[in-house]
């Protein structure tokens, strides 16, 4: 019996012996997949809002103005902005060349995840972690953006790799300490949460550092701080003078963390299940690693601390927590999650099967479930320009075009490449009164192509529809929409306003209030996103401060739940026929069910006019509008 057991042991042992050559082949495949996913038609990925925010700062002629007027008012360290300032002077504003360095650092980050997993635990952990990182939309998305996240992630991982060599390595060299210092310095130039992550890594090292290495370790840290010192005025200006690094965000929901984890697994049930089973496989097989190591706790602590700081700050001061905030600490959670694998838990070919499953299911979910190569490669700035060109070719001089966007130059970047002249771009500083004036000046044009990006307030869309109520076509992209509209019925068009009252009602001189219209919000579809009201009026003389009011009331008690009016300065209209609009957004804090809407004209200027008709318009939630971050179904 003893001999038989020994024989079985000898037969089983080589079966699970690691095969370094196969491991090298597998990591090569992982890197190849990561490269394909990030570099695939990279030049066709249009610039996004955040990228334009950075690129437009590079237009300063000299570096001094770039720092004073471009960097100081921003909320990011100088690193990526300064790199782009030099980079675009060599390669221009080509999407491929601007994005390429960040895609390459994203690929490099996948390899660094492998190295750290192997360094901290073993090759299996590195392979599986890198495979997951290669196919997660979270990392693919940020690798295709010319923003600090891919670069910051790369340098955080590089610092962590040097950190292990300095703190736990059997032999350390001067190169290790220099690499540790330089990578820590690079982290400080990328993003404020990469600075926080670098600080956490450094402080953690103090808990485990051998006594004889403390001097060199502190010198490395001091060296990184000295290198960072020239940018301290920028750091001070952005954090303590400007006083905001994220106030434009909304407060995080209680479900933020679970939503984030699903996002990193591509919101795909099969991918989540496959990764979950693989992580638990050592437990299921009874071959999990029982080795006690502080690195598991360190990896988890880094993520938890960063998340807790951002979450608490977002609730108590101003919102700063977003998905990108966690990109610098998340890799360590993934490495720890796969750390139950021992070197001999699986055979080499079983390792290959696990890697293949992660890559195949991850790629399938990225491409099909998340539609990444559709949504990422077709976005508002470029696609609105495409639709404008198509509509111009089809309708000629019968159509005019208007676009609203946060950054006017971003829309202009793509629209300037068309041959369209009868178009206008409104930006964040434009007011609705300007749009009304432009519409009136061009009222003889029978059609309108109207686009918006960056989730502009729906009152702009309602105003466009109020003047051109027949919808020919609507197209949505990530945070963007384009409508082809007409004043009169055309082939394949539909009237999108819902009449509430079309009996003319005159307002005499000095009259401020008039008739109200009420309707049940239960008549709206379940997926309604915004409600708009359009009042069509006729005024013989110029009027001002004429607004539409929307009240949302409880259907049973009639208690007022929400009140909204347009701005008085937007209520200026020249003599003639005009459309006055207002809009509200339904969200978790204001749902339409069990409510009624009351709407009326507030003639604050008390000029005579006639209210000819009042109608409502609604928009529906389209998952595509948030599809790069949220589930598509």
Regions found by a protein language model. Give the residues of each.
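Intrinsic-disorder/low-complexity peptide segments enriched for small residues
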Residues: 4, 9, 338, 483, ...
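Residue-level marker of intrinsically disordered, low-complexity segments enriched
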Residues: 4, 193, 422-423, 460, ...
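Intrinsically disordered, low-complexity regions of eukaryotic proteins
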Residues: 6, 21, 25, 52-53, ...
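N-terminal compositionally biased, intrinsically disordered segments and leader/signal-like regions
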Residues: 18, 174-175, 419, 542, ...
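Extracellular and organelle-lumenal recognition/adhesion modules and their flexible linkers in secreted
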Residues: 45, 497-633
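Membrane-proximal helix-loop-helix interfaces that form the catalytic/acceptor-binding platform
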Residues: 19-492
